[in-house]
UniProtKB/Swiss-Prot annotation:
Cellular component, GO, one term: nucleoplasm
Name under which the protein is recorded: Nuclear transcription factor Y subunit gamma
Subunit structure: Heterotrimeric transcription factor composed of three components, NF-YA, NF-YB and NF-YC. NF-YB and NF-YC must interact and dimerize for NF-YA association and DNA binding.
InterPro entries: Histone-fold, Histone_H2A/H2B/H3, Transcr_DNA_Rep_Reg
Keyword Transcription applies: yes
A molecular function (GO) term: DNA-binding transcription activator activity, RNA polymerase II-specific
Location of this chain's protein in the cell: Nucleus
Keywords of the record: Activator, DNA-binding, Nucleus, Transcription, Transcription regulation
Similarity annotation: Belongs to the NFYC/HAP5 subunit family.
Main location per the UniProt record: nucleus
Protein's job: Component of the sequence-specific heterotrimeric transcription factor (NF-Y) which specifically recognizes a 5'-CCAAT-3' box motif found in the promoters of its target genes. NF-Y can function as both an activator and a repressor, depending on its interacting cofactors.
């Protein structure tokens, strides 16, 4: 190895002075070596043997070879560290970095075999920042929006519920036009009833597939018709209303049969005047709500089925959203 420091500066630092006196001091130590000095090495001999065994051509290693290699490696590392420390002092730092060792390797020819092992430019690949997008599906509560306008009236109902199906549709009826609901799978024959002059109400009752639905009108039952009026102060007033035989028969036909079956109804209003009708089907447990419009009024029918074997009243409520001119909005209760 070279014995010259290779520095031309007049004012030498401590590292440069140590490097200049390095090889004379090493040669003096080698001449004064004894057998006892080879027993203790600064570098572990097991690691030196492991490096030597990496060569496939090496079959056997003598006892003296690791000792000599350990001493040579110690001298080599000391010289390389001194040359790298000079570069550290030139940059006015007190910490030895990998870049300092790379600069020492490139400046001196005896370290050329380390250029591929210790590259000069320590380039770290940029880390790729992957954006993780999480789509949180909020809960879908049941929301109903009712919109009431002037004639022709339009009532729109929108509902969403997880695990439950709610259908909403809007139909426009022209004067003299008749619309018949298409029976779905499991529905019985539509029942048509005359309610008022120039107005027809058609009720279609649906039943689960494979089950028979029988509409029976209870004999001996008394029907009491009440008018429900909501005042400006929010109070609810009930006034008895007289209905003809045809309307009472229509109410009896609309009532469900006692049992555990759930009845799902569709109501369509056929009017001669131009109006818009909203059909809403909401099935919750054993309760069913149906809504239809008549002119500027919104009617809501609630049907409740009771378990079989219980002799309880089966109410059916028909209530209006606003009060007409004659002040008669029927609410029908079946006892």
């Amino acid at each position: 190895m070279s014995t010259e420091g290779g520095f031309g500066s007049t004012s030498s630092s401590d590292a440069q002075q140590s490097l200049q006196s390095f090889w004379p001091r090493v040669m003096e130590e080698i001449r004064n070596l004894t057998v006892k000095d080879f027993r203790v090495q600064e570098l572990p001999l097991a690691r030196i043997k492991k490096i030597m065994k990496l060569d496939e051509d090496v079959k056997m290693i003598s006892a003296e070879a690791p000792v000599l290699f350990a001493k040579a490696a110690q001298i080599f590392i000391t010289e390389l560290t001194l040359r790298a420390w000079i570069h550290t002092e030139d940059n006015k730092r007190r910490t030895l970095q990998r870049n300092d060792i790379a600069m020492a390797i490139t400046k001196f020819d005896q370290f050329d075999f380390l250029i591929d092992i210790v590259p000069r430019d320590e380039l770290k690949p940029p880390k790729r920042q992957e954006e993780v997008r999480q789509s949180v599906t909020p809960a879908e509560p049941v929301q109903y929006y009712f919109t009431l306008a002037q004639q022709p009236t339009a009532v729109q109902v929108q509902g969403q519920q997880q695990g439950q199906q709610t259908t909403s549709s809007t139909t426009t009826i022209q004067p003299g036009q008749i619309i018949i609901a298409q029976p779905q799978q499991g529905q019985t024959t539509p029942v048509t009833m005359q309610v008022g002059e120039g107005q027809q109400v058609q009720i279609v009752q649906a039943q689960p597939q494979g089950q028979a639905q029988q509409a029976q009108s209870g004999t001996g039952q008394t029907m009491q018709v009440m008018q429900q009026i909501i005042t400006n102060t929010g109070e609810i007033q009930q006034i008895p209303v007289q209905l003809n035989a045809g309307q009472l028969q229509y109410i009896r036909l609309a009532q469900p049969v006692s049992g555990t079956q759930v009845v799902q109804g569709q109501i369509q209003t056929l009017a001669t005047n131009a109006q818009q009708i909203t059909q809403t089907e909401v099935q919750q447990g054993q309760q069913q709500f149906s809504q239809f419009t008549d002119g500027q009024q919104l009617y809501q029918i609630q049907q409740v089925t009771m378990p079989a074997g219980q002799d309880l009243a089966q109410p059916m409520f028909i209530q209006s959203a606003n009060q007409p001119s004659d002040g008669q909005t029927p609410q029908v209760t079946g006892d």
